[in-house]
Design a protein with these regions (language model features):
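Bacterial N-terminal signal peptides that target proteins for export
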Residues: 1-12
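Hinge/capping helix and adjacent helix->loop/strand transition within the periplasmic-binding protein
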Residues: 81-87, 101-187, 236-238, 249-282
């Protein structure tokens, strides 16, 4: 028993020493950041900003690897199963908060991941086609109450923030509108702009050009406060649904077991990066705002999102598979 105890103690000491050495030399080789979505989307843009910033501050390449599919869960699973050395990371989006309730099974568990930092949030804006006879969100709710089930709203796929935002409006306002899911924002835009599906929540940066052209009318934004991109558009909460908040968000995760000093370093670098003026300016163009905070805050934030949307998804009977 004594020999076993001494061996166990020696293993622990050796492991701690190795972790300390790794942290001191990290990164000594290129780091891969897996993005669970195709190039060009908001998650990809945010991920590339983080990769570029970390490469500049830490002096090694941070290479983006796009592995799209299943609302980002395929990419997340790659990282969850990677060696916990800090050389395989992922930037996840708010779909990470909905996936556990949306899918009957996932190729990873939350305990397989180590939160490293919160990056940013992005609001959504509820837009309607100009043919909809409503100039305010309150007028829209009155219209929906007068004609339950008559009007439809679009989303880029089931379980996304666009979809769940609509479901939350239905629950909080006691209105009925029909969900029409698509396979991506690019696919749904022609129908939205033509009025075939006349309303939806969508990323504010994506919708702003169409709003400025007069092709779509903004009624409310989904964040708790107004967005600088559309300062005259009230929030949903201001418009009668107090407490309403739906945000896109992005976080940096590593495999569970990544040495704490490496997590601490990544967290510090992310917190410094997201307040740099050049990054804040890029965020502003996306309608995004820096988040930041400790790894513990990141874990609590993700847990709260999963609990909040898990209830909405289960109560609404939404499934992605």
């Amino acid at each position: 028993m004594l020999n076993f105890t001494l061996r166990s103690f020696a293993i622990i000491v050796t492991s701690l020493a190795a972790a300390g050495t790794l942290a001191q030399s990290y990164p000594s080789q290129p780091v891969r950041i897996v993005i669970g979505f195709p190039p060009g989307g908001t998650t990809d843009v945010i991920g590339r900003l983080v990769a570029q910033g970390l490469a500049e501050s830490l002096g090694k390449s941070f290479i983006v690897d796009n592995r799209g599919g299943a609302s980002g869960t395929i990419g997340t699973a790659i990282v969850a199963k990677a060696e916990p050395t800090g050389y395989t990371l992922t930037v996840v989006s708010s779909t990470h908060g909905t996936a556990p309730a949306l899918y009957s099974s996932l190729p990873y568990q939350e305990k397989d991941l180590a939160p490293a930092g919160l990056i940013a949030t992005t609001p959504y804006v509820f837009v309607v086609h100009p043919t909809i006879p409503a100039n305010t969100f309150q007028e829209l709710l009155a219209l929906l109450r007068q004609s339950p089930g008559k009007y439809s709203f679009a989303s880029s796929s089931p379980g996304t923030a666009q979809h769940l935002g609509g479901e939350l409006v239905k629950r909080m306002a006691s209105v009925d509108m029909v969900h029409v899911p698509y396979k991506g924002t690019g696919v749904l835009l022609p129908d939205l702009l033509s009025g075939r599906v006349p309303m939806m929540f969508e990323n504010v940066a994506i919708m702003t050009p169409h709003i400025r052209k007069g092709s779509l009318r903004p009624l409310a934004v989904s964040s708790a406060k107004r967005t600088p991109l559309l300062p005259d558009v009230p929030t949903v909460a201001e418009s009668g649904l107090g407490g309403f908040e739906v945000l896109g968000w992005f976080a940096l995760l590593a495999p569970a077991g990544t040495p704490p000093p490496v997590i601490k370093m990544l967290n510090a670098e992310v917190n410094k990066l997201i307040v740099k003026p050049s990054v804040v300016e890029r965020f502003a163009a996306l309608g995004a705002e820096p988040l930041g905070g400790t790894p513990e805050r990141t874990a609590a934030f993700i847990r709260n999102e999963q609990e909040k949307w898990g209830k909405v998804i289960r109560d609404s009977g939404i499934k992605a598979d």
